[in-house]
Amino acid sequence: MDKIIKTISESGAFRAFVLDSTETVRTAQEKHQTQASSTVALGRTLIASQILAANEKGNTKLTVKVLGSSSLGAIITVADTKGNVKGYVQNPGVDIKKTATGEVLVGPFVGNGQFLVITDYGTGNPYNSITPLISGEIGEDLAFYLTESQQTPSAVGLNVLLDEEDKVKVAGGFLVQVLPGAKKEEIARFEKRIQEMPAISTLLESDDHIEALLKAIYGDEAYKRLSEEEIRFQCDCSHERFMNALASLPSSDLQEMKEEDHGAEITCQFCQTTYNFDEKDLEELIRDKS
């Protein structure tokens, strides 16, 4: 079971979120059949979306678009405040570029571009915020977005570790934010611990699992747990939703589908579920338009 734990330091000067998103990213890999670099890039963006959504309240939905200029194409994810996230990468077939330690690089395949966040509060007027991609490695891009767009100094870690067969072994992340009133010596202590922190994957694979992430962030400093919530890859597509999408097409297009294709087939980009609509479905839509 994937989860996110939200905490705040006893002094109230810092807050931290830690996430185990292994099943989330594993599900995304299975649904989209992504190759190594595509898996890591999509996985990191899914985790980034989970972090951002955890900062919201109510029925807010949050879309993250990593719009790079290189071979991965666009990465698009959508998360809500109930722990659900979905997403896809335009090119799922980008394979490996590894460092000497075996880490999969994604920056070269993302390229230059924009980090776009669309926040939908359900009012009909979504809020868009754009920052440039700093490295294309997603974590640094999210930290820059939070610092620049939300004016909150932030440290972010996102990690997707693959096994020898390039399947998701472990995935997770953290967010640490400086809150008003933080003292210089406190900031220095947190910065030092984060700089010296082992890889997220190493901590998640340890016996203490997600608790090891909290230990690495806080050290011996006291903190309060605010909440612990489940998170998951979950698409909200349905036959009815795509039926409504077809209903927005002109009658002439629906008539053409009926006569030439004897129906319609639509595959959800976010989860690869395929929905079929027969001639009767199309006839019903045409009739409703007349």
From Swiss-Prot:
A GO term for molecular function: unfolded protein binding
Keywords per UniProt: Chaperone, Cytoplasm, Disulfide bond, Redox-active center, Stress response, Zinc
Pfam family, one: HSP33
One annotated GO biological process: protein refolding
InterPro entries in the record: Heat_shock_Hsp33, Heat_shock_Hsp33_C, Heat_shock_Hsp33_N
One cellular component (GO) term of this entry: cytoplasm
Domain of life: Bacteria
Disulfide bonds: C235-C237, C268-C271
Processing after translation: Under oxidizing conditions two disulfide bonds are formed involving the reactive cysteines. Under reducing conditions zinc is bound to the reactive cysteines and the protein is inactive.
CDD domains in the cross-refs: Hsp33 (cd00498)
Compartments, record wording: Cytoplasm
Entry similarity comment: Belongs to the HSP33 family.
Main function: Redox regulated molecular chaperone. Protects both thermally unfolding and oxidatively damaged proteins from irreversible aggregation. Plays an important role in the bacterial defense system toward oxidative stress.
Entry protein name: 33 kDa chaperonin
